[in-house]
Structure formats: structure tokens, C-alpha cells
Amino acid sequence: MRLRNIPRAESVLEACKEVVKDPESLRGDWNLEFKKEQPLHIEIGMGKGQFLLTLAAKNPQINYIGIERYSSVLLRAVEKFQELEAEGKAPANIRFICMDANDLPTVFAPAEVSRIYLNFSDPWPKARHARRRLTSNEFFKLYDQILTADGTVEFKTDNRPLFDFSVEELETSELFVLNQLSYDLHNDSTMNQGNIMTEYEAKFSSMGNPICKLIASADNMLQYPDLYTDPVCLHFFPFLSYINREHILCSCFSWKVEAYVTSDDTEL
């Protein structure tokens, strides 16, 4: 399907202060943009914006960024935000970026993003385009460059072939592990808890299409293999409280993991 160009999109986005025009300049400093040091969640391919705007309103303790590649698509989400703004209901903890997902590492620093949402992404059905799918291992490598060690990727779709492909990619991934999945989200009492539907989700669900969802996380054992095999570390493993690419917070055996510690370490 050919994307319809909307001539006024560029001017509307340019005038909206919530649209970040030079996102690369904020790499590593996104908390300065939001004025609050809070976890950062992003949605890649935010569509009309209902999902992320609802999340932002419900969770003021989290900062959100909606990403779209095309200005004519991002326009719809920005206009929805502006409607809420006119009513005095717009969440303050949301920003928008018009960019290609391939450029994520130039916009976000390592361990700067806590969660990535992928909702009803383009399935790119032709086999030769598999690398373009947002749930391909090519993209999981990019996500690994920006996610915290406890970061997650959440993916929803009604496209079963795409979902099966995504599961297979995770099963062969060297960086992520599959934590949860459902082939019928709306009838899954556990995974559907707190679910916020996108516009597409509501449409496809009303047509009787089951919605699939998976949650994946970084495989920390691959990040610090020595830590998980050293007998002394394993003996005191219950005291290990947090690991990511930059920090290890621990007690009782900080001397043992000194080689892994880089900065801002806190003993519990």
C-alpha cells in the first residue's frame, strides 16, 4: 500500500515543540528534555498515537517517545496530542521523533531505554525483505545497543506468519530471550491484564482476528558470563541485586566483582 503524502505534515511537526527536531543532540541526555530523571520507554511505529498517549497519561512516572519514519504518519499522532492539549489533558511526559529505526543507536545511548514497544509493525511479507522486519535479529541487535540490562521488548500483531517469524528469531537470538507469549492475547487473563489497545488492535479484534503478543528481554548471562560461572559469585548470587552494562549493585562480595564495576556503584 502506497503511503499518502500530506503536504502540511512537515509544517505542523515543525511547529510542535513536543516533536524533537535534532534527537541526536540528546543522546545520553534525554532526561534533560523531559526535565525529570525517569525510565524511558519508546514505541517504534506509533501510528495514530492512541496506545502511547494513553500509556503516558496513565504513567506520569515514565517518560515516553513515539517514533515514526514518515511525517505524514506521525502527523496523526501529533494532531491527537494537540487535541488533548487544547482540552488541557495532554500528558507532559511524551515526545515524538520522525526517524528511521535503523538510526536508534545514534539517538539513544547504551542502557538509556528501558522498554521498546512494537505494535502491528509492517510484516514485510516477501522473504527477501525479512531483515526489514522490526522483530528480525538485525533489529534486535540494535535494540540491545540501547536497552538497559533489565530492558524488554513487547510486540503485538494480528499477523500470525510475522509472529511465528518473530518467535523463531528470538529462539536463535544470542542477545535476547523469550519470556512470555500468547497467541490469543484478549483471552489470556495473565498477559491481557492492563492491556492498552491500539487503533489497529481494536479494528482487527472486532473482525475476530486473534491478537498475538510476546515479551522478550536481554539475556544477561551472555552479558557477564564470568559472573555467572565463578563459584564465589554463584555462592553469593542471592545478594546480587542489579546488573546492567554499566553498573553492578551488590553487597558482601563487591571485591569479587570489582572487575565488572564501572561507575555509580551503590552498596545495599
Feature locations, PLM:
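SAM/dcSAM-binding transferase cores
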Residues: 1-39, 61, 178-268
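Class I SAM-dependent methyltransferase "Motif I" SAM/SAH-binding loop
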Residues: 44-47
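Glycine-rich SAM-binding Motif I of class I
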Residues: 49-53
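Conserved SAM/SAH-binding beta-strand->alpha-helix loop
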Residues: 70
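S-adenosyl-L-methionine
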Residues: 79-110
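A short acidic, Gly/Pro-enriched loop at the edge of an enzyme's catalytic core
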Residues: 106-115, 120
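A short glycine-rich, Lys/Arg-flanked "PGG" loop and its adjoining helix->strand segment in the class I
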Residues: 135-149
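Conserved beta-strand signature within the Rossmann-like core of class I S-adenosyl-L-methionine
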Residues: 150-157
